[in-house]
Amino acid sequence: MFDVLMYLFETYIHTEAELRVDQDKLEQDLTDAGFEREDIYNALLWLEKLADYQEGLAEPMQLASDPLSMRIYTPEECERLDASCRGFLLFLEQIQVLNLETREMVIERVLALDNAEFELDDLKWVILMVLFNIPGCENAYQQMEELLFEVNEGMLH
């Protein structure tokens, strides 16, 4: 499913291609690209749930309103998000790329993924997808994009 999400993000969203694509055509394009129907269905469902945040139909769980509070992760969250992922989320909060709400959206979307392996690079892409879809997060999205791509470019020098 995560491969389908990455393909969709890079092909349709990140490239600013036509965003209004017929779902049947999209499913056919994904099938033609070699993705399994179940993965396609799960990815589209994942994106629907993300769109619920955008449309105000869903809100992230509010655990604390004090910005100085520390997020304690559940065992399930710790299993999916290793120490480097949790540290990266904290770093993004400290530099104000994520706020309490967007952090919870990211965590919820990570837990909704069905892949067994989940790494820091995967988290970065989920963060980009969440920030891209949330109104008012354009600056945070741009900062995250710069962080993601500058780090990779810096490695080439």
Swiss-Prot record:
Coiled coil regions, renumbered to chain: none
Disulfide bond sites: none
Protein origin, superkingdom: Bacteria
PANTHER family cross-referenced by the UniProt entry: PROTEIN SMG
HAMAP family: Smg
Similarity comment: family membership: Belongs to the Smg family.
Official protein name in the record: Protein Smg
Source organism per UniProt: Escherichia coli (strain K12)
